[in-house]
Amino acid sequence: MILPHDISRRAFGAMVLGSTAAACAPQIDDAIAEPVLPAQEDWVEGYGPILDAGYNLPGIPARYLEGVNRRITGLYQGEAPPNSLDVDPYAKFLYHVKADGTATRYPVGVGRAGRSIRGRATMQFMRAWPGWTPTQNMLRTEPEVYGDFRAGIPGGLRSPLGARALYLFRGGRDTFYRIHGTNDLPSIGNSGSAGCIRLFNQDIIHLYNQITAPMPVLIRSPAESLRVDPENYDRGMELPPTMIAAEELIGPDAEAANRPPDLDALSPGMI
């Protein structure tokens, strides 16, 4: 079993290991293809394959989990109140802040320049295996990226929102920003979305199981990020939009691949 390494950072001191849309762009769904699973001992702890609601989620390869790009729990040194979510879009982390002074930190992917929510919001409700529909603004500004998906994509392995989604509201109104899972593994730790906050599917499932709605959310400003975590400020890179052929996500072949597997047909060791 691979154990986390090179994770400690001053801004999130005294770390210890954990116990184990909207305005969101569609991404290539690695889960549609039949996954080739490495040997069990090659999975990083907490990031192996998961069978969830009949869907077979593949594990996350170790190359995407280097350094700080994995989930850990330790002392919280940020400025958000207990029982809240603290998002640092510059260091590319999300913290679940707990009442005992600790937090679980998750690596995230965030919006490209100028495409992110800032300030305070409320996570009003949560959904498992959510569907996704591009907003009118997305269709208007980037029709070449989103036009083929204007009718939406139902929840499941094809959905760009992944295994779970948390819906952000402000002043009682939907912001159309989400905190959600993704199959676009290279985007975690980078800026590449249309504004939403992405987590590995294993991480969004872990977070979903720890929280309840409603919950306050703080999205840090540049000054807050520099003050709390200067070492990781502005880590990662900006990625271009991912162009996807419509047949990857819609059509008979995609629909067939999206169906949950027959649980009775699963062989031992498959997950």
How should each PLM-predicted stretch be described?
Residues 2-197, 201-271:
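N-terminal pre-domains immediately preceding structured catalytic cores
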